[in-house]
Amino acid sequence: MAELFYDDDADLSIIQGRKVAVLGYGSQGHAHALSLRDSGVDVRVGLHEGSKSKAKAEEQGLRVVTPSEAAAEADVIMILVPDPIQAQVYEESVKDNLKDGDALFFGHGLNIRFGFIKPPAGVDVCMVAPKGPGHLVRRQYEEGRGVPCIVAVEQDASGKGLELALSYAKGIGGTRAGVIKTTFTEETETDLFGEQAVLCGGTAALVKAGFETLTEAGYQPEIAYFECLHELKLIVDLMYEGGLEKMRWSISETAEWGDYVTGPRIITDATKAEMKKVLAEIQDGTFAKNWMAEYHNGLPKYNEYKKADSDHLLETTGRELRKLMSWVNDEEA
């Protein structure tokens, strides 16, 4: 079973005695920086000149400097910029400012796991990753609660990396809910697999296939949309609240019977075999290598896939139907 840590297992004074730089001010960056500050931590935010986030961070009372200045000042550096540019930010702004005894923190392990960033031997390399979006992390902190976090130590130069990571997690409210110890390898590989095979890739492909099956059989796109996409939220919310058991308790017996007898016909042994191939490609670095190459080549295939899905009948139908739903916020991303 997983090893769990709570408030009494973490010493907030450890992170309060350090100087923290948060590089990036997106969803997680703002939650980390503001919550650490409110926990009595010396925080600065590192943003490039011209960043649209600078004014927002300053309005919220944070000191903003360049990433290089932030890294030079701090002895705990949390990198929360997007995965594909982390290595560039590290090379340009962090690498030459690291000193023995410093700590390099991440919210996701991809760049360490696959060697895009190779820290020097004298620094701690840790992860603190809340299992929720930044706005929830911040709101829970302000309400005196917290979002569960995972922590990991890839390189423990000081011999006190775990204590530091737990202290950081306490500073953003994580230990109020509970913190699970993991490794960079486990976090990275399971996170990527979950996104690709289930949460994003698997779910999107399942929804599209169901929608296409109904419309190709002559059913109205609007009805197919409701049955294959819109109502998915109702089911996922029940699973989120109480697992498969609560979902099945809440649906009709007809739906539950269909779940048992039809689900295994959709997700077959062949599907699971393909999932294992996906996992292997994550583990051996194939996915990370291909994704970084795609990103740094200007995202041609990425944009092609994005455009194709945007033009899909599922999406055009959904955009019109959501206009009927006053409770749905369908602002353009």
UniProtKB/Swiss-Prot annotation:
GO molecular function, one term: ketol-acid reductoisomerase activity
KARI C-terminal knotted domain location: 183-328
Catalysed reactions, semicolon-separated: (2R)-2,3-dihydroxy-3-methylbutanoate + NADP(+) = (2S)-2-acetolactate + NADPH + H(+); (2R,3R)-2,3-dihydroxy-3-methylpentanoate + NADP(+) = (S)-2-ethyl-2-hydroxy-3-oxobutanoate + NADPH + H(+)
Necessary cofactors: Mg(2+)
Annotated ranges, domain KARI N-terminal Rossmann: 2-182
Residues annotated for Mg(2+) 1 binding in this entry: 191, 195
Magnesium listed as a keyword: yes
One Gene Ontology term, aspect cellular component: cytosol
Binding-site list for NADP(+): 25-28, 51, 53, 83-86, 134
Cofactor note text: Binds 2 magnesium ions per subunit.
Residues holding substrate: 252
One of the GO biological process terms: L-valine biosynthetic process
Function in brief: Involved in the biosynthesis of branched-chain amino acids (BCAA). Catalyzes an alkyl-migration followed by a ketol-acid reduction of (S)-2-acetolactate (S2AL) to yield (R)-2,3-dihydroxy-isovalerate. In the isomerase reaction, S2AL is rearranged via a Mg-dependent methyl migration to produce 3-hydroxy-3-methyl-2-ketobutyrate (HMKB). In the reductase reaction, this 2-ketoacid undergoes a metal-dependent reduction by NADPH to yield (R)-2,3-dihydroxy-isovalerate.
Name the record gives this protein: Ketol-acid reductoisomerase (NADP(+))
Source species: Streptomyces griseus subsp. griseus (strain JCM 4626 / CBS 651.72 / NBRC 13350 / KCC S-0626 / ISP 5235)
